[in-house]
Amino acid sequence: MRLERLNYNKIKIFLTFDDLSERGLTKEDLWRNAPKVQQLFRDMMQEANKELGFEADGPIAVEVFSLQAQGMVVIVTKENQEMDTDDEFRDEFIEMQVTLDESEHILYEFATLDDVINLSNRLYNLGVTGGKLYTWDERFYLWVEEEEQIQLLKADFIAILAEYGNPSTATIYRIMEYGKELMDVNAIEQIHNYFVKKQNLS
């Protein structure tokens, strides 16, 4: 579970599928307002209070986004409405706004350009050449669409990506808006040709 404060009344929580399975939950369970799901959100709010000082001292709205093969992003917004602190975690104050984003595209973030180069070299040798490369907030982001993954099984593709980076908790729309596009087509092939192939020829 990774937490990030977006502003004074909004936080973002990234849950991996392992986080869910440890609690006996599946992705599909989040679309239901079951007791185990309510307990998950209570746990998340307690963790947010501990790590970020984010107190659920009023009604909260919860938006859930499913990232294909990566996990879940949960956006929690604290509404500006007074309430009794004894009711802090009462279920009626949790407004579920489930947004199902079942995009088959994959977005990963990387700490350094070297991570992207090493990943691209490995993927290129496996026949993967597509993708778009972005940079934002001193990190690099590789966006790969579904039709560009056909050379590998999705599970294998994700496993390789995970060796070099992490699933992005930012959406592609946020990165497009605030970041900079470095390569708009065949990023993996371009990186391989420029950084790996060129180096080998020198």
Swiss-Prot record:
Keywords: Competence, Sporulation. The keyword Cytoplasm does not apply. GO terms for biological process: establishment of competence for transformation; negative regulation of establishment of competence for transformation; negative regulation of sporulation resulting in formation of a cellular spore; sporulation resulting in formation of a cellular spore. One of its GO terms (molecular function) is protein-macromolecule adaptor activity. The keyword DNA-binding does not apply. InterPro entries: MecA_C_sf, Neg-reg_MecA. It comes from the Bacteria. Homodimer. Belongs to the MecA family. Enables the recognition and targeting of unfolded and aggregated proteins to the ClpC protease or to other proteins involved in proteolysis. Acts negatively in the development of competence by binding ComK and recruiting it to the ClpCP protease. When overexpressed, inhibits sporulation. Also involved in Spx degradation by ClpC. The N-terminal domain has binding sites for ComK and probably for unfolded/aggregated proteins; the C-terminal domain interacts with ClpC. This is Adapter protein MecA 2. It comes from Bacillus cereus (strain ATCC 14579 / DSM 31 / CCUG 7414 / JCM 2152 / NBRC 15305 / NCIMB 9373 / NCTC 2599 / NRRL B-3711). The gene is mecA2.
